[in-house]
């Protein structure tokens, strides 16, 4: 009863129970330490070694995980980190815990005496023993790839004094004699090294090592023994059949070279007792197992790289391969290594050329008898990079690719097809031409290498008017029908023959592949007329729904990403501004000289290359890296820019010591004659640098190489060597005005030789590049050098 005699009920409206107070529990603080130990391992794996050390210092629990678990160190990343006295303990600890990258880099660092300074006394012996230890460890950690460490210690060896390569070889051999396990791959590497000597005794030793390695289970050694015994087995049908069975066994176990040889052996199926259907199935399995790996992933990793930049790099590599007469397989493997590395690791634009030439050094050592030495590779880049830069890049590449150098290429499948099917020589050359053109275009990587090789053969046979371009036999061998190949054929034709190639600043297309196949060895096949798009559609029996595909790069501007070095300065200035130059420049050498220069130089260029090749020029094991290669190489001004003629600035060659009387205005007629000279077949200009309007910049192009008087350089003959060049790129700003300046002619190009005014001998004058630019412009420049 309430007040006033009012009765209240117990409803919720009249009566309220006191509410219960809910006590909020304080949430438990969860940190990274609360995660299970297995999850922490996955987080710590693949971190860089610097990050692992930083995490280790955070908490005692993390410190225990890092210190007591080998898997953390085995998976640690040493990307862009090189052994030095300060971090040597980290590298050694990681290598001993099973880190492949650390072991490879330590072996290379000791072999080339790079980063780890060792006293000159007994340096080869000390470094050789240490390099042997880590190379052996790297080979034991090598999983799924053929033995590879032999490519670092292969001949030529030094003939004077102690040789670090020889010390490594002997140390590895002694290790194999002491240890019973994990020595099959080491024995194979020792055999590969000895097999490259011409001495019969060493050849026999190599054969014995291969036999021992094969007995220990090395599949690659077993295949090499089969290859050496193949010639003798052919004479006896019984032995031939036994040899074929062994080859089939090696192929089934995964040896790529054995798989290729097995497919080629099916050409003699009757002698082997195989039915046509069985032999076709063997080849078909090889072709159908080929998988496409899109190279467009490169551009998702390399944000500053585009298809045109890659085109220029590959075009330059083709020129190097042509100059050094490397095989198509070597070229294709080099490009594959470049693309695989670009998909895995970020590469600044100014290091693209370094990556390309380092991949070529590795691939020539792995598959060729004639190699590209480190010193010669540095020379080919016009000394843009140093000896140690290339050595370190080799370590980065091998570790990033996990020692796997040999991969299937378009050339492999093409060779199988040309072995199994009778094809005219002209058609073979055209097929090879198409396969190398495919290297330049990443969009063609959407097709598997086997399909691309089949499409190249079909297009070649169509071009040469074959009545049955794709027979039933080819269908059975490859598993690709005529209709399956039509899209690939159309894409291949469009990219190779319709789309315009990037052009340099003189609107000269970059056509290194075409020039390569203008040689008589290939029947000058690149000069033949090809089918038009409409003719190809008619030959394929498909309707042409649209007009001929439009070309790209025909108009508009493509910003330059490569640049020549800014002038030849003194050695001290070059060393002081090394990082500045590396961030802005790249050059390339010219491959050929004019007839006048060849007459003057005689065999000097050959002598220069001889001095830069082989072990005596390389001095790799001795660590003699000081000094620059004296022979200057020309610079490829491969500029990918469409120039408006009104904005084109006059460009002429210049020397470091220009003559004062040449400072006046240049004769317009002489300039016109100079700019009309056709490009030489050597490497083309790769890069341009931006400059401010009105600034005087002197440059040299191919005209300076092809028309310079051989006797007008300096007394001697060195001045007529291939000359570096530089080029200019237009500013992207819409308000950029045409540049007007007084260009002066090169003393080497225009002036006859004059006697010295005094008895003091004149200093050697070298062709230079002068590119005046601002710091802001440097940030927008990328490079590639040949």
From Swiss-Prot:
PTM comment text: Degraded when the spindle assembly checkpoint is activated during the G2-M transition. Degradation depends on the C-terminal PEST sequence.
Source species, domain of life: Eukaryota
Source organism per UniProt: Homo sapiens
Main location as per UniProt: nucleus
Residue span of motif Nuclear localization signal 2: 568-574
Its biological purpose: Substrate recognition component of a SCF (SKP1-CUL1-F-box protein) E3 ubiquitin-protein ligase complex which mediates the ubiquitination and subsequent proteasomal degradation of target proteins. The SCF(CCNF) E3 ubiquitin-protein ligase complex is an integral component of the ubiquitin proteasome system (UPS) and links proteasome degradation to the cell cycle. Mediates the substrate recognition and the proteasomal degradation of various target proteins involved in the regulation of cell cycle progression and in the maintenance of genome stability.
Misc remark: Founding member of the F-box domain protein family, which obtained its name from cyclin-F. Member of the cyclin family, however, unlike most members of the cyclin family, it does not bind or activate a cyclin-dependent kinase.
Residue ranges annotated as motif D box 5: 767-770
Intervals of motif Nuclear localization signal 1: 20-28
Protein name: Cyclin-F
GO CC annotations on file: centriole; centrosome; cyclin-dependent protein kinase holoenzyme complex; cytoplasm; cytosol; microtubule organizing center; nucleoplasm; nucleus
Positions of short motif D box 1: 310-313
Disease affiliated with this protein: Frontotemporal dementia and/or amyotrophic lateral sclerosis 5: A neurodegenerative disorder characterized by frontotemporal dementia and/or amyotrophic lateral sclerosis in affected individuals. There is high intrafamilial variation. Frontotemporal dementia is characterized by frontal and temporal lobe atrophy associated with neuronal loss, gliosis, and dementia. Patients exhibit progressive changes in social, behavioral, and/or language function.
Alphabetical UniProt keywords: Amyotrophic lateral sclerosis, Cell cycle, Cell division, Cyclin, Cytoplasm, Cytoskeleton, Disease variant, Mitosis, Neurodegeneration, Nucleus, Phosphoprotein, Ubl conjugation, Ubl conjugation pathway
Bilayer-spanning residue ranges: none
Assembly, per entry: Component of the SCF(CCNF) complex consisting of CUL1, RBX1, SKP1 and CCNF. Interacts with SKP1. Interacts with CUL1. Interacts with CCNB1; interaction is required for nuclear localization of CCNB1. Interacts with CCP110; this interaction leads to CCP110 ubiquitination and degradation via the proteasome pathway. Interacts (via the Cyclin N-terminal domain) with MYBL2/BMYB. Interacts with FZR1/CDH1 (via N-terminus). Interacts with RRM2 (via Cy motif and when phosphorylated at 'Thr-33'); the interaction occurs exclusively in G2 and early M.
């Amino acid at each position: 009863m309430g007040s006033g005699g009012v009765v209240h009920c117990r409803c919720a409206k009249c009566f309220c129970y006191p509410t219960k107070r809910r006590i909020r529990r304080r949430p438990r603080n969860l940190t990274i330490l609360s995660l299970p130990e297995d999850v922490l391992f996955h987080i710590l794996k693949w971190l860089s070694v610097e990050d692992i050390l930083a995490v280790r210092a955070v908490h005692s629990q993390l410190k225990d995980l890092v210190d007591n678990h080998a898997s953390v160190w085995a998976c640690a990343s040493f990307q862009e980190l090189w052994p030095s006295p300060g971090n040597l303990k980290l590298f050694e600890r990681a290598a001993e815990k099973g880190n492949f990258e650390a072991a490879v880099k330590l072996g290379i660092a000791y072999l080339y005496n790079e980063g780890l300074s060792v006293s000159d006394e007994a340096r080869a012996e000390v470094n050789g023993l240490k390099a042997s230890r880590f190379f052996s460890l790297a080979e034991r950690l090598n999983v799924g790839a053929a033995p590879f460490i032999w490519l670092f210690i292969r001949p030529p060896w030094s003939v004077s004094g102690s040789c670090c390569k020889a010390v490594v070889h002997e140390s590895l051999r002694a290790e194999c004699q002491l240890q019973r396990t994990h020595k099959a791959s080491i024995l194979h590497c020792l055999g590969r090294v000895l097999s490259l000597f011409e001495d019969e005794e060493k050849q026999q030793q190599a054969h014995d090592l291969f036999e021992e390695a094969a007995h220990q289970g090395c599949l690659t050694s077993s295949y090499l023994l089969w290859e050496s015994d193949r010639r003798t087995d052919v004479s006896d049908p019984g032995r031939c059949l036994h040899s074929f069975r062994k080859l089939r066994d090696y192929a089934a176990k995964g040896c790529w070279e054995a798989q290729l040889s097995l497919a080629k052996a099916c050409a003699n199926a009757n002698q082997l007792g195989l039915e046509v259907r069985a032999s076709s199935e063997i080849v078909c399995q090889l072709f159908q197992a080929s998988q496409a790996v899109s190279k467009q992933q490169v551009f998702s990793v390399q944000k500053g790289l585009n298809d045109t930049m890659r085109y220029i790099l590959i075009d330059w590599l083709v020129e190097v391969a042509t100059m050094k007469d490397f095989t198509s397989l070597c070229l294709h493997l080099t490009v594959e290594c470049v693309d695989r590395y670009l998909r895995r690791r970020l590469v600044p634009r100014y290091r693209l050329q370094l990556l390309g030439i380092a991949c070529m050094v590795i691939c020539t050592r792995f598959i060729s008898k004639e190699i590209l030495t480190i010193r010669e590779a540095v020379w080919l880049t016009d000394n843009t990079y140093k000896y140690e830069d290339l050595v370190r890049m080799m370590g980065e590449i091998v570790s990033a690719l996990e020692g796997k150098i040999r991969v299937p290429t378009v050339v492999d499948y093409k060779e199988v097809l040309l072995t199994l099917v009778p094809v005219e020589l002209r058609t073979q050359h055209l097929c090879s031409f198409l396969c190398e053109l495919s290297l330049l275009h990443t969009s063609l990587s959407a097709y598997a290498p086997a399909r691309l090789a089949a499409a190249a053969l079909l297009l070649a046979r169509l071009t040469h008017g074959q009545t049955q371009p794709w027979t039933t036999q080819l269908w059975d061998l490859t598993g690709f029908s005529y209709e399956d190949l039509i899209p690939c054929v159309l894409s291949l034709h469009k990219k190779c023959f319709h789309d315009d190639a990037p052009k340099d600043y003189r609107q000269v297309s970059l056509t290194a592949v075409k020039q390569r196949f203008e040689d008589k060895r290939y029947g000058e096949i690149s000069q033949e007329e090809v089918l038009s798009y409409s003719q190809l559609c008619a030959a394929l029996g498909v309707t042409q729904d649209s007009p001929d595909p439009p070309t790209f790069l025909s108009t508009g501007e493509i910003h330059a990403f490569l640049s020549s070095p800014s002038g030849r300065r003194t050695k001290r200035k070059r060393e002081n501004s090394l990082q500045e130059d590396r961030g802005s420049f790249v050059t390339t050498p010219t491959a050929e000289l004019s007839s006048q220069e060849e007459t003057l130089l005689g065999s000097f260029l050959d002598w220069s290359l001889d001095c830069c090749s082989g072990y005596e020029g390389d001095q790799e094991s001795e660590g003699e890296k000081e000094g620059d290669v004296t022979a200057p190489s020309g610079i490829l001004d491969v500029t990918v820019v469409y120039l408006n003629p009104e904005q084109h600035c006059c460009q002429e060659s210049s020397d470091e010591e220009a003559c004062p009387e040449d400072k006046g205005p240049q004769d317009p007629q002489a300039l016109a004659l100079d700019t009309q000279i056709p490009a030489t077949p050597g490497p083309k200009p790769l890069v341009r640098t931006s400059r401010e309007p009105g600034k005087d910049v002197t440059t040299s192009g191919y005209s300076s190489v092809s028309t310079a008087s051989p006797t007008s350089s300096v007394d001697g003959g060195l001045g007529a060597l291939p000359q570096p060049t530089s080029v200019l790129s237009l500013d992207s700003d819409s308000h950029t005005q045409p540049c007007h300046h007084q260009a002066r002619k090169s003393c080497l190009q225009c002036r006859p030789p004059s006697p010295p005014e005094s008895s003091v001998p004149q200093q050697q004058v070298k062709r230079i590049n002068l590119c005046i630019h601002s710091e802001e412009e440097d940030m927008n420049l990328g490079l590639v050098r040949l």
